[in-house]
Amino acid sequence: MVSFSKNKVLSAAVFASVLLLDNNNSEFNNNLFSKNAKGLNSNKRLLHESQAHAGDAHHAHHVADAHHAHHVADAHHAHHAANAHHAANAHHAANAHHAANAHHAANAHHAANAHHAANAHHAANAHHAANAHHAANAHHAANAHHAANAHHAANAHHAADANHGFHFNLHDNNSHTLHHAKANACFDDSHHDDAHHDGAHHDDAHHDGAHHDDAHHDGAHHDGAHHDGAHHNATTHHLHH
């Protein structure tokens, strides 16, 4: 008959407890590592999603100081974006830099202080939109400079097809002194599509060396309401009959 001493039995019990504790610790550590890894992956995923939305700016709702959202196309949800730079199609953008105060903001609805805003609806106190320079199709633009097809534009300079009164303040002896041009009225070897400038094809409310279709001038293919040496097709205002 085999006999065991109390010491041997006790030692075996302690050893078994140590093994059990070690296994439990290993399982706990493995679970903790797994959770940390999942958390890290989740953070990476959120970071990538954030970066994707920042680049696309599609859901940038009420984005403040979006200065580097440069030429963002279809920023449909940049609603009331503050200080958005080159936000396109911004709806009710207030005080946005180059959107409301927007430079080349296209189709800005109620854009305030927009520079070169094309198709701006009810732009108030806009710089070069209401006080807008070459704003195309601005609705209710006040004091628009070279606004094309502006509805109710007050004190518009060289506004084409503007409804409800314009005060033309022609100056210098360049294209600004040429009033009411007809089709194919040429100056400075270029023709224009619609209110543009600075030597470029333009698609929508832009200027200075780019392809643009709307609201620009100076050496580009344009259709209506332009100046500085171009073929003009519709109701241009730079040549006296």
Swiss-Prot record:
Q: Where is the composition biased (Basic and acidic residues)?
A: 52-76, 195-231
Which UniProt keyword terms apply here?
Answer: Malaria, Repeat, Signal
* Compositional bias annotation for Low complexity: 84-145
At the top level, the lineage of the source is Eukaryota
Q: Which cysteines are joined by disulfide bonds?
A: none
The reply to whether Signal figures as a keyword in the UniProt entry is: yes
Extract the Pfam families matched here: Plasmodium_HRP (PF05403)
Signal sequence: where? 1-21
Query: InterPro entries recorded for this chain?
Result: Plasmodium_HRP
Q: Where is this region: Disordered?
A: 52-145, 195-241
Q: Does the keyword Disulfide bond apply?
A: no
Protein name per the record: Histidine-rich protein PFHRP-III
